[in-house]
Amino acid sequence: GWYSVKDESYYQDKELIKTGDVYTTKDGSQVDWIEEDSFFFKLSEWQEKLLNFYEENPDFVMPKSRMNEVKSFVKGGLKDLSISRTSFNWGIKVPESDHIMYVWIDALTNYLTSIGYPNITDEKMEYWENCIHIIGKDILKFHAIYWPAMLMAINHALPKTIFAHGWWTNEGKKISKSSGNTIDPNQMIDKFGL
């Protein structure tokens, strides 16, 4: 599928812009067509359940404009999600295979493993039941589509709310380590004090 190394993400055709022979995301990240053996999560089977959940829980994603983005994406059709890679050997290994977990699957499951899944105590479950994810808009589909479908697949409670904010910018561009335009907080403290 279409993969952006910069974003560490796969994209569907409907998410891309074609200029000549080059495909990019709406945010300008170049994507390349990659083929490799992979395990898949049957995301396509969760489309209707996700849409029903969004209708029954209208405040699941905030602000409403972000919820509208999520619903529109899901209504457009979901494809099964690649959850492993074979083109490199670092990362969390998939048991009894030569596959490595796709980085976003690893990252999302950390929310549960950090509180002891599958043996979550009642005390820690109380935190989960009141969980609010505060995320950047660029990782909304991972948190509001892929993650809820995965949780539904294991019959686990979903986070209470996902709040997706815009980006912090520096000279009009998204601040990110990969772009090299981050602001050093220590320099700001030296300049302005605490």
State where each predicted segment sits.
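Short, flexible, mixed-charge glycine/proline-rich loop motifs
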Residues: G1, Y11-T19
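Structured secondary-structure scaffolds
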Residues: Y3-K6, T19, Y23-L194
